[in-house]
Amino acid sequence: MGKIIAIANQKGGVGKTTTTINLAASLAAEGKHVLIVDADPQANSTSGYGIDPKQMTSSIYECLVDDYPVDGSQVPTCVEGLELLGSRIDLAGAEIELISRDNRESIMRRALATIKDKYDYILIDCSPSLGLITVNALTAADSVIIPVQAEYFALEGISKLLNTIRIIKSKLNRQLEIEGFLLTMYDARLRLANQIFEELKGHFGDMVFDSVIPRNIRLSEAPSHGLPALVYDPGSRGATSHIALAKELIMKHRRNYHAHGNVQPA
């Protein structure tokens, strides 16, 4: 059965979409079957793969609001083994349309349950808003990756997200865990960046990924070409850092799988 990971942080500009786009491509490059769910009305994960939201016949919006099946709504990407369930601006109005629905926080979980077995990993790119769609994503997820920008005020707002995760874990999704904190936009030359990394490690210990995502021009350029960094410039630090993250994530899941007495890695 696949693992559903939400990429979330209510602080904007920390690299959620960049992480989603490039971690997904890197997991696929490691031989995993991966689905991106773009749960942000800005649809940056969708356009970041060169897909025009206006040209899609269905999206996450139709799957949540109109009960379209997820299987058949996803589209292929330029990366073998990676598909995308796209988003569009209509999703911004979905919270109002879903407000009267029974069990409205669990609509995404029910939708993704129908295809979870088809994938090794499903990555959900969350909106910075902690509204109903993000609550749906966290209710559907097995775990959360929290990108943290290597800049001043980096830890600002994390306590609010952690409190939201605690509430969802207690009320809606008892299996929800924090997969890890990921330092993004890291510049090893800056003392502040290293201080933030040490501060994260001091607060959260082993929950902080060893892999860090550097500031990288090619990583910033790639989405405008509709490509992940791994395709746009495979040798760039932006690409290689996400490959390292994918390997770290896979190894972590393999260790956890064996620790529970299983024979084959997830």
Where is each model-derived feature located?
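P-loop NTP-binding core
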Residues: M1-A266
